[in-house]
Structures are given as structure tokens and as C-alpha cells.
UniProtKB/Swiss-Prot annotation:
The keyword Membrane applies. Keywords: Cell inner membrane, Cell membrane, Membrane, Transmembrane, Transmembrane helix. This is UPF0060 membrane protein mma_0129. Belongs to the UPF0060 family. It is found in: Cell inner membrane. Its main location: membrane. InterPro entries: UPF0060.
Length: 109
């Protein structure tokens, strides 16, 4: 159960970070309203708060979180941007998720 909660927390954290970065991108690159910076700042604040909820040491959390971030970013590419990932993208996600699993589930001394 701990692992499921941890992975779910990683996914929520990644979504908050991606939203917090995507909204300014829309403003800067696609001419969207500057008011998107308000929800972007809120999303990044939520991102930082969610990072603080992770039970492990910060360095380990950031390392393991990277795997979830890559997976969520690829899903974002497909769902939001409408670009289907390549087979190599999926291989890369599998490798990063394997690394995340090793970091999360390795025995601790």
C-alpha cells in the first residue's frame, strides 16, 4: 500500500509541475493571456508542497520522482499536445520507471 501511495503522489506531483510550467509556455510561446501565470504559480506552489509530503530523504525523492515525471510528461505529450510518442519514447519511459522502482523498492540498511 505504501508503494501505491508513493507512486500516486509522484504522479500528482508531476502533474502539478507540468501544469505549472505549461501555462507560462502557453503565454510565452503561443500568445495566451498573461493571467495564466496566476494558476501556474499556484500549480508550482502545489508542486513544492506535494514534494514535501514524500516520506524519503529529499535526494532520493527527487531521483525516484524523475521516473514518474518522464512517464507523465510523455502522457502529456500524447493527451494534451496530441503527439503520439514513438516506440523509443516508450522504451525510455520503461527504463526510467525501472530506475524509479530500484530506487523506491531497494532494501535499506
Amino acid at each position: 500500500m505504501f508503494e501505491i501511495k508513493t507512486v500516486a503522489l509522484f504522479v500528482l506531483t508531476a502533474i502539478a509541475e507540468i501544469v505549472g510550467c505549461y501555462l507560462p509556455y502557453l503565454w510565452l510561446r503561443q500568445g495566451a493571456s498573461i493571467w495564466l501565470l496566476v494558476p501556474a504559480a499556484l500549480a508550482l506552489g502545489i508542486f513544492v508542497w506535494l514534494l514535501s509530503l514524500h516520506p524519503e530523504a529529499a535526494g532520493r525523492v527527487y531521483a525516484a520522482y524523475g521516473g514518474a515525471y518522464v512517464a507523465v510528461a510523455l502522457a502529456w505529450l500524447w493527451v494534451v499536445d496530441g503527439i503520439k510518442p514513438t516506440n523509443w519514447d516508450f522504451v525510455g519511459v520503461a527504463v526510467t520507471l525501472a530506475g524509479m522502482g530500484i530506487i523506491l523498492f531497494a532494501p535499506r540498511a
